[in-house]
């Protein structure tokens, strides 16, 4: 089994490159194609998918990205093209979304249905949670926290600091729409909680 090829990149297109390896030109499809530069000498990790009709080579920047690709295509209904689409967001983000069961973020990726997002999380959440703990500082720095998650974390921290209970915070969070104006969100949440307490006391 060939794990990687080393050679000179002769051409880069929107979703594939041509690698000159031992005098042969290999056409390789790759995620985040902008990472690969024409005339660059480099190692490319590969996965070859072969059936009775075609043989297609997919290429990756590093071994970890290759492993995640191989994991993804094990999911029923998830083919190589969808796996490449998923990896276009960065393999570091993929394992983060799966480890944290962020179905919403996965579902926003082209060609990823709710069913597929659930299947990925079900199959690999535990594995990728362990994977997350072993990331280097450079790899961890590439993880993008969705704005909504960041806002939610700020909101939760503020509400807890103000002394509200988890149940009260959840009640407010279900009712309001979070945005970058955390102060206003907190004010609205306090009003909702106060109204709820007032209504409860009247019963």
From Swiss-Prot:
Does this UniProt record's set of keywords contain Transmembrane?
no
Gene that produces this protein: ruvA
Q: Which SMART domains match?
A: HhH1 (SM00278)
Q: Which domain of life is it from?
A: Bacteria
The record's similarity note reads: Belongs to the RuvA family.
Report any one BP term from Gene Ontology: DNA recombination
Q: State what this protein does.
A: The RuvA-RuvB-RuvC complex processes Holliday junction (HJ) DNA during genetic recombination and DNA repair, while the RuvA-RuvB complex plays an important role in the rescue of blocked DNA replication forks via replication fork reversal (RFR). RuvA specifically binds to HJ cruciform DNA, conferring on it an open structure. The RuvB hexamer acts as an ATP-dependent pump, pulling dsDNA into and through the RuvAB complex. HJ branch migration allows RuvC to scan DNA until it finds its consensus sequence, where it cleaves and resolves the cruciform DNA.
> What Gene3D superfamilies is this protein classified in?
5' to 3' exonuclease, C-terminal subdomain
Protein known as: Holliday junction branch migration complex subunit RuvA
Annotated GO MF terms: ATP binding; four-way junction DNA binding; four-way junction helicase activity
Q: Which UniProt keywords apply?
A: Cytoplasm, DNA damage, DNA recombination, DNA repair, DNA-binding
Coiled coil, from the record: none
Segments carrying the region annotation (Domain III) are 147-203
Is Oxidoreductase set as a keyword in this record? no
């Amino acid at each position: 089994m060939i794990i990687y090829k080393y050679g000179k990149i002769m051409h880069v297109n929107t979703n594939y490159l041509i690698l000159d390896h031992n005098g042969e030109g290999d056409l390789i499809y790759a995620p985040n194609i902008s990472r690969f530069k024409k005339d660059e000498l480099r190692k490319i990790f590969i996965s070859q998918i072969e059936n009775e009709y075609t043989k297609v080579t997919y290429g990756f920047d590093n071994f970890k990205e290759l492993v995640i690709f191989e994991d993804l295509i094990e999911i029923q209904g998830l083919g190589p093209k969808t796996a490449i689409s998923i990896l276009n967001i960065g393999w570091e983000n993929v394992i983060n979304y799966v480890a944290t069961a962020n179905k919403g973020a996965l579902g926003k990726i082209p060609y990823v249905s709710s069913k597929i997002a659930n299947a990925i999380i079900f199959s690999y959440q535990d594995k990728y949670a362990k994977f997350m703990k072993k990331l280097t500082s450079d790899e961890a720095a590439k993880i993008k926290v969705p704005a909504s998650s960041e806002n939610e974390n700020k909101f939760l921290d503020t509400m807890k600091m103000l002394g509200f209970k988890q149940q009260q915070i959840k009640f407010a969070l279900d009712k309001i729409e979070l945005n970058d104006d955390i102060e206003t969100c907190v004010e609205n949440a306090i009003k909702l909680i106060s109204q709820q307490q007032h209504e409860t006391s009247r019963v």
